[in-house]
Structures are given as C-alpha cells and as structure tokens.
C-alpha cells in the first residue's frame, strides 16, 4: 500500500472528513467562548506550590471547563493520576455503605474491577458494603425495559454509564441514546445520580453528557481534552453539590477545591483544551482512514468508515494472535518516541489478560497520541486510537499495514 492508495481513499472519505471538520469548528467556538467569558489571561499560567491556596489559574480553568460542559461546576486537577482515578474518586464520593451502584452498560472497563470489588480487593466499594448490579446492553443499545423494571423495584444511588467500549466488542454510546436513557431514569426517580465515564468521547460530537441530563461526567486529560499537551490529570464536571463531594474526596473534607497546587500545569491544561477540538478531529480522521483501508484488506473493523462515531477508538478484529502483535508493533514503529522499541505482551495492573501496547507518545499512557493496544485473548482485537495530527497518524497506519501485509 502506498500514498497513491491513500489519496484514493481520502477522495472517498472527503464527506466524512468534512463532517468531522464541522464538529471541530463547533467545538472550537465552544472553547473560545468559554475562554472569552472567563477572561483567560497570562496570569492564569502562574504556578502555586504547597497547599495551593489562591491558585487563580486553577480556578479559572475550572470555570472554563464548567462552561464548555454547560454545567454548574468542574474539578480539573493534576492530582488525578488518570481517568480511572477520577472515576474512583467520584464513586467513593457519591456512594455510602448500603447504597447500590448500577452499571447499565454491562461490565465496566477492566481497571474498575478492583474499585468495584470483583476481585475482593480490601479497598473496594464492596468492602464498604456498596452493592453492585449491572444490566447489559442489547444490540448496542440500552435495555430500556430491564432498566425500567429494575428501577421501579429497587433503590439505586448511582447509575454508571461507560460511553466508550473498553476492551469489548460493543459500540460506543451516542449522545442521543444517552439522552433517551437519562430521561427514562429521571422519570422513575429524579434523585438517582447519573454518572458518565466520558473517556475517549469528548469533542467527538457537539454535545457532552452534562448537556443531556447527566449529573456528573468524568474524563482524563491524557486523552481528548489534554490534546497531547497536558502531562497528566483528569476532570469531573457536573452539578455543584456532587462535584463538591468529589473535591472533598480527592482532597479533604472542609478544604475541598480550595487547595491543590497547580505545580506549573495550568498553561498545559489551558493550551490542551484550546487545541483539543483540532486534535480530536485529527484523531478521528486517522481512525476513519484506518477503518477504510483495513476493511478493504478484508479485516473486520468497527466502526466502519461511514458509520457514526462516539469515541476516538477503532477496533480491528484479527482472529490471529500473531497478526495482532504485528499490527501493534507496526504502530510502535510508526510513532515518534521509542520507534525502535518492540512492544511485548505482559501482565499489567488492573487487567486479567496479558496486554500488548504500542504507545510511542510524549506522555506515558497518552491515548490521544497515536496508540494501539489489546488483550491477548480471542478474537485478538486491536484497539486503535489517537493521532495528534492526521499526517502523523497516517504515517503510523501505513507502517502498521505494511507489517501485516508482508
């Protein structure tokens, strides 16, 4: 496969790319309006240490995020290690002994196993007598009848919705489906807290979960909204009283969001958010191209190049362990950092299967930079995401295709 083949593919994909550009422009307007409204200025880049009292930039960033998400309050902190850390913080903040957590998108991502208590971790929600229940999706949509029946017969404190696919074969959850199920939930019990794991999904569409009724929304800054510029961190956005509880869980009761030094992160948080619409668009174009080229080579891909996307993840089903490994190795070879390194399947914290991962990124574990990973289990699916620029993404895709077609 050569650049001429890619040009032919890009001609076919021009309408899809145009729609991605339209969404990028809409979200760019949303971000810049939030910057203007909150008078973002150079003083916001100043750093604090120690307790972090009076961190002007940090406070402005959280107001900007609240406006972008059209919600009451946001907590945007470099003290969060990951999106999983932010999800854990939110769950422990919102749930109390005897409460029930209900997942309506089936089993959550593997890294939540120890948080929920599937493996009897002594620090899990289960160890605090928090009950967990789940309702699986049906044909890539919510099981509305089961959800309605369960909620009418059981008291639920928090409903968790994971929009992206994790290491599953289902489709990601659209904003339209999210809005429909939240309306159903609130019609039965308006006090149920709907929490959405929004990782990999920000700025893929023109609305975020908090715009369609979600009470709280959580995501990572080494994914979409950090745009490859933020070195770490995560956010929690939503209703003021709930975000306040989360800030007290992250920090300490009584101090909440008034402490937490930025340690020089403010500029990268602001610049990352500023660039995020464009970087997400580049990532989407990268995986759309990959979907088209790999489908034409006979591979089972999802979503297909012309299907709706709700996250930045593309799955490629290889049904072959060696092909999966070769593809991931090819992405690593096509990356900017550690291109001469070879990914090796290994056990990783939070996962039951061996994982192979290509992440030639400037920030460790960054998923918005070109990356590819997958568990070594049948049917041997590669999960491809990212691309800081479309051009670099294209180069990596071609390198990976070259490796599996030798």
Residue ranges and their predicted role:
Residues 24-28:
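Acidic, PIN/NYN-like endoribonuclease modules and their adjacent C-terminal/linker elements
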Residues 295-405:
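Conserved C-terminal alpha-helix-loop-beta "cap" of PLP-dependent enzymes
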Residues 72-79, 337-341:
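Short, well-structured beta-strand/strand-turn elements
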Residues 2-14, 21, 31-44, 52-55, ...:
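Conserved PLP-enzyme active-site core in the AAT-like
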């Amino acid at each position: 496969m050569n650049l001429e083949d890619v040009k032919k593919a890009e001609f076919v994909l021009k309408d899809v790319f145009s729609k991605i550009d339209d969404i990028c422009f809409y979200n760019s307007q949303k971000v810049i309006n939030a910057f203007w409204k909150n008078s973002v200025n150079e003083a916001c880049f100043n750093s604090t240490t120690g307790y972090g009292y009076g961190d002007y930039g940090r406070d402005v960033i959280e107001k900007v995020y609240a406006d972008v998400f059209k919600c009451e309050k946001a907590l945007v902190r470099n003290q969060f290690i990951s999106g999983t850390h932010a999800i854990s913080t939110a769950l422990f903040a919102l749930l109390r002994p005897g409460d029930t957590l209900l997942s309506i998108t089936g089993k959550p991502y593997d890294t939540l196993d120890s948080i929920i208590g599937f493996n009897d971790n002594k620090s899990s929600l289960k160890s605090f007598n928090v009950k967990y229940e789940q309702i699986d999706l049906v044909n890539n949509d919510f099981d509305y009848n089961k959800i309605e029946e369960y909620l009418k017969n059981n008291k639920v404190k928090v409903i968790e919705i994971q929009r992206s696919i994790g290491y599953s074969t289902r489709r990601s959850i659209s904003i339209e489906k999210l809005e429909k199920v939240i309306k159903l939930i609130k019609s039965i019990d308006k006090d149920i807290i709907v929490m959405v794991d929004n990782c990999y999904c920000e700025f893929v569409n023109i609305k975020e979960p908090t715009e369609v009724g979600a009470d709280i929304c959580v995501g990572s800054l080494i994914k979409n909204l950090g745009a490859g510029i933020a070195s770490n961190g995560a956010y929690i956005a939503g209703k003021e009283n709930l975000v306040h509880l989360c800030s007290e869980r992250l920090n300490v009761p009584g101090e909440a969001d008034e402490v937490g030094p930025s340690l020089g992160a403010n500029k990268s948080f602001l610049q990352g958010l500023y660039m995020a619409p464009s970087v997400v668009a580049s990532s989407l174009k990268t995986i759309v191209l990959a979907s088209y080229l790999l489908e034409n080579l006979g591979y089972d891909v999802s979503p297909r190049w012309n299907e709706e996307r709700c996250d930045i993840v593309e799955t490629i089903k290889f049904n072959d362990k060696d092909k999966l490994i070769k593809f991931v190795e090819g992405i690593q070879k096509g990356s900017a950092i550690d291109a001469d390194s070879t990914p090796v399947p290994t056990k990783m914290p939070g996962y039951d299967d061996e994982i192979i991962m290509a992440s030639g990124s400037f920030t460790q574990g960054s998923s918005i930079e070109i990356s590819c990973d997958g568990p070594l289990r049948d049917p041997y699916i590669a999960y491809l995401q990212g691309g800081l620029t479309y051009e670099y993404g294209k180069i990596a895709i071609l390198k990976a295709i070259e490796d599996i077609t030798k």
